[in-house]
């Protein structure tokens, strides 16, 4: 249903526009679907054209797909401009995309660090800056992503953990600096059954039980109904008095004090 037809219905994101990076698959796709169901327009940013086009066709006129390499700094401004051109304004920035390689710390190379920071931390940083003036006009929201790998120091995850904790740090700085502009900045640390996790489980028999052994709920989250619904809350007016926080959406795997 088009966003314009949702006026008067009980939806939480009516007339809001969001950018979701890595939005064509996994958690990003789950967030996109959850946002659309709540009335939002979404610019899906990805490099998987087949998946991006399919999602846009599935969800209709509330979604536009943009092929863009977020590891190129100059693309941040064009991504924001594309969202504003398509839907007239920007309310929510979801920095979900990230790529990395696993290795023990002593085997982690500079190239591995570069990959993680160039696809995770730096695009988050660039897009936040590019989106700021538009978000400030709309009392907007930024939703960034952390990981238990960084919070808990997971072995073989040095490059990913480092970039994710850098994202948490810059999110807290932005939360302090941008509150005066009406922008809230929060972080989700998820555990979800994505395509990548499914492939990892299939390639490593018995690993699923070990992965969930420290999770009280003993299951992976669903990208849409578990992670996406929390993102809807953070993007909605219901979370307008909340900023600088990390939401652990991981079935109780990590309970921060």
Which residues does each predicted region cover?
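Alpha-helical segment proximal to the catalytic Tyr-Lys
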Residues: 133, 176-180, 240
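Short C-terminal tail/terminal secondary-structure segment
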Residues: 2-12, 152, 243-257
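Active-site helix of classical SDR
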Residues: 128, 163, 171
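Short, small/polar-rich loop/turn modules that mediate ligand/substrate recognition or access, typified
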Residues: 94, 179, 184, 242-244
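Substrate-binding pocket helix/loop in short-chain dehydrogenase/reductase
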Residues: 104-105, 109-117, 211
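C-terminal substrate-recognition "lid" of short-chain dehydrogenase/reductases
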Residues: 87, 125-128, 134, 220-249, ...
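Residue(s) in the substrate-gating loop at a strand-loop-helix junction
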Residues: 147
């Amino acid at each position: 249903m088009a966003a314009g037809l949702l006026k008067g219905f009980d939806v939480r994101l009516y007339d809001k526009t969001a950018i979701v990076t890595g939005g064509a698959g996994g958690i990003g796709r789950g967030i996109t679907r959850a946002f659309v169901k709540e009335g939002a327009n979404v610019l899906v940013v990805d490099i998987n054209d087949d998946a991006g086009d399919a999602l846009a066709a599935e969800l209709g006129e509330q979604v536009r797909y943009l092929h863009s390499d977020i590891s190129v700094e100059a693309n941040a401004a064009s991504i924001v401009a594309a969202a504003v051109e398509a839907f007239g304004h920007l309310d929510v920035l979801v920095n979900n995309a990230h790529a990395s390689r696993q290795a023990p710390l002593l085997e982690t190379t500079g190239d591995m660090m570069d990959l993680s920071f160039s696809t995770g931390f730096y695009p988050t940083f660039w897009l936040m800056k590019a989106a700021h003036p538009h978000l400030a006009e709309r009392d907007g929201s930024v939703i960034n992503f952390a990981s238990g790998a960084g919070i808990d120091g997971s072995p073989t995850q040095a490059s990913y953990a480092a970039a994710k904790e850098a994202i948490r740090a810059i999110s807290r700085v932005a939360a302090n600096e941008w509150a005066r502009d009406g922008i809230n900045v929060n972080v989700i640390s998820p555990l979800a059954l994505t395509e990548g996790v499914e492939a990892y489980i299939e390639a490593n028999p018995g690993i699923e039980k070990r992965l969930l052994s420290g999770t009280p709920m003993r299951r992976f989250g669903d990208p849409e109904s578990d992670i996406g619904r929390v993102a809807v809350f953070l993007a909605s007016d219901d979370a307008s008095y909340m900023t600088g926080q990390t939401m652990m959406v991981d079935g109780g795997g990590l309970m921060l004090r």
